[in-house]
């Protein structure tokens, strides 16, 4: 995805984003300190909606399975225009969110798709995480690429009103196998947009987005997404 399209995506996502423990007894060891978060807000895949201004007319995502065990299947076929999905994070979670967890599996990798190489910016699966501070949007795009070094950060695009980094979360690997991901939201934001300052201010988490594409490589691309939750 080129820089111009990435900026358009930011604008599109912006539209979407407008019990106690018993006391230990004398014979029992003390309880461990509580975790920094104790709640888990599940996000059904059916909650994701098309980001109209960044999407073509043909929908290629489909919710599969019963409501209590569903996943989102995505299959891009050229020459379709790409379609991006997004959702608003509930107001109550925007400052309280600590971690994001999800599962995904690549089914068809888009050839040599590599978000870090110009002209080959396609991925079997992408998860966008969006924060907003004042008038500025901050985005980290986690991708499952067909090629490239796992863990690499690239396509850093920072301006007055928008900033986006791409992180190659997975690259290549076996297709058809579910992988669970968990990211520390505040640590990720500080690493990318606060120079690693552990006390850097973190703005509201306002949105999430999904994308499976193969338009630059002109290659079929497919993946499944499931198990989204925000821990707080």
Describe the predicted segments one by one.
Residues 24-54:
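Extracellular carbohydrate-recognition regions
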Residues 61-82:
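Short carbohydrate-recognition loop motifs
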Residues 87-100, 172-175, 201:
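Extracellular/lumenal carbohydrate-interaction signature centered on repeated Trp-anchored short motifs
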Residues 103-109, 132, 186:
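Solvent-exposed strand-to-loop "edge" motifs in beta-rich extracellular domains
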Residues 110-129, 137-139:
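Beta-strand acidic-aromatic groove motif in beta-rich domains, primarily in extracellular
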Residues 119-127, 171, 175-220:
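Extracellular beta-strand ligand-recognition surfaces/modules
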Residues 138-195:
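Extracellular carbohydrate recognition and processing domains
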Residues 208, 223-230:
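Extracellular beta-strand elements of beta-rich domains used
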